[in-house]
């Protein structure tokens, strides 16, 4: 009987102390905020950042893989959030108008302008350097390692 009381007496302080243990909240997971064209392009011009355009379609399996594998990488997210304004662009969406400065474009017109008339397939990543008003494109799926190198090259290009 005394062993039960002794055990209870030892257990009570342990339970009380564990109740006051500070919560260990994990660090918040970094998130990538995607913009629509009109908001994102204007923001990039205003802030002097690089526009990163992810051209995709709803039926594109490689686009979905890139969303799932590449754009969820914490290092990629951090780099994009710091140096770029990311924009999702689906040229197959209808009844939308995209603005660049004082001009308006239909989705297929913007796509033709981005590709310079040479369709590249999906996904394609476009880097628009707003300070120089120049454009680079990189067609196809990119894993985190190769995409990180692309981001570094775009950042270096923007500083020239």
Predicted regions and their residues:
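Detector for the c-type heme attachment site
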Residues: 64-68
